[in-house]
Design a protein with these regions (language model features):
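P-loop (Walker A) phosphate-binding loop of NTP-binding proteins
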Residues: 29
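Phosphate-binding P-loop
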Residues: 14-21
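N-terminal pre-Walker A segment at the start of P-loop NTPase domains
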Residues: 1-13
């Protein structure tokens, strides 16, 4: 991914897939592009409000999306038990509203989530990003 717009485009692409994920786990260091990817996802869902990382609020719900979007950020939760508990609460709510759940800093979780898609973003030396998508049930893309 050569720049943040390419990262957003990847987010839009994921939502447009016939078998798009209902649970997307994002991993990567600060500045790797996790929130930019969520901006692309939200754009493809018709969400027009600004998308920022919910680092302090921990989660943000966008019920107007098609489908709705729940954006969870586990950055501040250093203990796995707290991250797991919050994730399970948000997952239940997302399921109830038919939403896609996107989790930033998913490496904080210790849960087995076989239905999840996992996207790892990392920095490249040329300033771009490398994205590796793993679909647990269907292998790696």
């Amino acid at each position: 991914l050569k720049d943040l717009e390419a990262t957003r485009a990847l987010g839009r692409y994921l939502v447009q897939q016939p078998e798009r994920p209902s649970l997307l786990l994002l991993e990567g260091t600060l500045g790797a592009g996790k929130t930019s990817l969520v901006q692309g996802i939200a754009s493809a869902m018709g969400i027009n409000e600004p998308i920022t990382s919910p680092t302090f609020a921990l989660s943000q719900h966008y019920p107007q999306g098609k489908p709705p979007l729940v954006h969870l950020d586990l950055y501040r939760l250093e203990q796995q038990a707290a991250a797991n508990e919050l994730f399970l609460q948000e997952e239940e709510e997302a399921l109830g509203m038919g939403a896609m759940l996107v989790v930033e800093w998913a490496e904080r979780l210790s849960l087995q989530l076989p239905e999840a898609w996992r996207l790892k973003l990392s920095h490249r030396n040329d300033g771009g990003r490398l994205a590796r998508l793993t679909r647990s049930k269907a292998g790696t893309c």
